[in-house]
Amino acid sequence: MVRCDRGLQMLLTTAGAFAAFSLMAIAIGTDYWLYSSAHICNGTNLTMDDGPPPRRARGDLTHSGLWRVCCIEGIYKGHCFRINHFPEDNDYDHDSSEYLLRIVRASSVFPILSTILLLLGGLCIGAGRIYSRKNNIVLSAGILFVAAGLSNIIGIIVYISSNTGDPSDKRDEDKKNHYNYGWSFYFGALSFIVAETVGVLAVNIYIEKNKELRFKTKREFLKASSSSPYARMPSYRYRRRRSRSSSRSTEASPSRDVSPMGLKITGAIPMGELSMYTLSREPLKVTTAASYSPDQEASFLQVHDFFQQDLKEGFHVSMLNRRTTPV
């Protein structure tokens, strides 16, 4: 289900990228951004010697784009003229905002920049479909489409704001009522919507791919660790804790037995004799009461008395050593 949704998102992203670029390219290349009335088509405003046109003449209908204005009616019907954003009869302050707005409107930098970004974003989308493992390509495409949409909307705002500088030479009282926007303008606005949608989809695809890749890596790591033979062994921390506890127990047991008596027992009696004494008692355990004899009891008591005598002598020597040892 996730793969199906992602495939559908990728298909919509590809189609949206193509649609956004096509809409913006058509909008820039056509001259139907604005319908307005202009006196340029009947030749009344070609010379300024005759004065302004009569009030009844609103001008002939024209359609204009970003760079040209074309006449639909009048003497010059079917002819197109280059838009002059800076008429010679008007004086403009070069530091004014209107002059800067006319410069931006004349250059059409934002629509052109938007088209270039849309083209680059479409190329990134195509490369992302070819190199599906490269998630950064899809992210770059999303960023490019978002930037293209922002550039597009800025260009549209500038175009609307500079509508007073339209090539029609209408009087100020007629400028508010005798123009409307054409389908090229709406194509540009629709391109903005599609570009932003494609950008959001591309970023969403990148996020989902990143999550799936992280989950897959974690699952493979857990699977590899569970199948490893080291996973069946106790953990290092547990082993270290046990080793510490055992070392502490082994260190603590001599400390309990450290006493002059205990030390001198081992020092006074050789290990061979002690083992001999210990082994000498083994026959007593395995013999029965019928094999008891007074000679064996006398020999055992003699050994026991000897052991007690050596123990006392060793303890006496250790006490003397403790008294004579300087502090």
From Swiss-Prot:
It comes from the Eukaryota. It is a multi-pass membrane protein. The keyword Chaperone does not apply. GO terms for molecular function: calcium channel regulator activity; channel regulator activity; ionotropic glutamate receptor binding; voltage-gated calcium channel activity. GO terms for biological process: positive regulation of synaptic transmission, glutamatergic; postsynaptic neurotransmitter receptor diffusion trapping; regulation of AMPA receptor activity; response to cocaine; transmission of nerve impulse. PANTHER family: VOLTAGE-DEPENDENT CALCIUM CHANNEL GAMMA SUBUNIT, VOLTAGE-DEPENDENT CALCIUM CHANNEL GAMMA-4 SUBUNIT. Interacts with CACNA1C. Identified in a complex with the L-type calcium channel subunits CACNA1C, CACNA2D1 and either CACNB1 or CACNB2. Acts as an auxiliary subunit for AMPA-selective glutamate receptors (AMPARs). Interacts with GRIA1. Regulates the activity of L-type calcium channels that contain CACNA1C as pore-forming subunit. Regulates the trafficking and gating properties of AMPA-selective glutamate receptors (AMPARs), including GRIA1 and GRIA4. Promotes their targeting to the cell membrane and synapses and modulates their gating properties by slowing their rates of activation, deactivation and desensitization and by mediating their resensitization. This is Voltage-dependent calcium channel gamma-4 subunit. It comes from Homo sapiens (Human). The gene is CACNG4.
